[in-house]
Amino acid sequence: MGFMRKADFELYRDADKHYNQVLTTRDFLALGVGTIISTSIFTLPGQVAAQFAGPGVVFSYLLAALVAGFVALAYAEMSTVMPFAGSAYSWISVLFGEGFGWIAGWALLAEYFIAVAFVGSGFSANLQQLLAPLGFQLPKVLANPFGTDGGIVDIISLLVILLSAIIVFRGASDAGRISQILVVLKVAAVIAFIIVGITVIKPANYHPFIPPHNPKTGFGGFSGIWSGVSMIFLAYIGFDSIAANSAEAKNPQKTMPRGIIGSLLIAVVLFAAVTLVLVGMHPYSAYAGNAAPVGWALQQSGYSVLSEVVTAIALAGMFIALLGMVLAGSRLLYAFGRDGLLPKGLGKMNARNLPANGVWTLAIVAIVIGAFFPFAFLAQLISAGTLIAFMFVTLGIYSLRRRQGKDLPEATYKMPFYPVLPALGFIGSLFVFWGLDVQAKLYSGIWFLIGIAIYFAYGNRRKKK
């Protein structure tokens, strides 16, 4: 199969029949909300408010949600027509050709590798902070990644990624049940923060709501709000993890749109509420450099016990995110192996009809990144790779509509206001990508060069055999 040759819909559908269709709308809502409302809601709002937007950070969240919403609608339609493992990779391979599908999938693979490592490291840092008052302190060699503050391996990051892989290895239904339990706790903690935080809001902290723009620092005005969008967009990318597991959905024509759109709507409401309460409790400048603004704001307001409880539940939230990312990433690796673009072993199922090799490959790579190497400078790569995949998917809606009822099934859910909304989704994703810092775009370029080299040196050659 050449770069431009389109993949066969029937082959993909038949190849994925081995998956057990066990995931319900509730499972997808739990995975989606758990992945979206994870590390970001407890870390980003204060930093973006202090660095870019002031109280106007809520507009950054809403604008990011608007762009993500356009893309989510496209994902919902795609997943009802093609409920395949691999999500964007499989869809783009069918619509535009294998080579373009590989580029989209390679972009998402960067997201999963780095995001699993990123969340694992965040889990480690928060757990160490939570246990410090109890006198628990790891030796530096086991507390930090290699070369960071005397560290050799971040042992907690290693163990939590390993645990998430074991749970996913047991099956998607087990992961879904655990996610449902943990996501309820996390949403309850967020709501508790909102209710308590409202009682200590000082209206003066909202003035001016949109601070004047400072061209020297980039702070304030619409420019500051848009700079916040590029940083915050990372918070909304979790709905791709739902689509990546669509091969395991019960009645995907109904469960997929409900899971994707529902999880995003819940996330938007919670993000906006937390952000408004946070900047109302204390001056936005007080959150500068603060990686745990929610817990800090509660402590400073005299709610130390609730602060500890929220931090503990935040850890549960990060664990849900790990489950979602490992689930989705392993299915993407399976799809690459299924099609011969990566070693065929990744495309094999075990006796329980699970892509075990994909699960362990993802876990091992993420452990190496998160436990042994400092990776903070790669964080924006998560957004960069995902945004490129999002652009492919929104453009793919035009090809999908032309082929529905011909060589592809009719969608049971269709993106509204066609052809305007797909275009807005593409343009919005492009603008957010353009707003990323230069290093993120540079590193994403290097990642894609590596991917293209692998495709022509290995994947394309294997496909021809």
Curated annotation (Swiss-Prot):
Its main location: membrane. It is found in: Cell membrane. GO terms for cellular component: plasma membrane. Disruption phenotype: Deletion mutant shows a strongly reduced uptake activity of BCAAs and methionine. Deletion of the gene results in the loss of most of the BCAA uptake activity of L.lactis, and deletion of this gene together with a second BCAA permease, encoded by brnQ, further reduced the viability of the strain. Gene3D superfamilies: Amino acid/polyamine transporter I. The keyword RNA-binding does not apply. The keyword Transport applies. GO terms for molecular function: amino acid transmembrane transporter activity. Induction: Expression is repressed by the transcriptional regulator CodY. Belongs to the amino acid-polyamine-organocation (APC) superfamily. Branched-chain amino acid transport system that specifically transports branched-chain amino acids (BCAAs) (isoleucine, leucine and valine) and, to a lesser extent, methionine. Important for CodY-mediated regulation, and required for optimal growth in media containing free amino acids as the only amino acid source. This is Branched-chain amino acid permease BcaP. It comes from Lactococcus lactis subsp. cremoris (strain MG1363). The lineage of its organism: Bacteria, Bacillati, Bacillota, Bacilli, Lactobacillales.
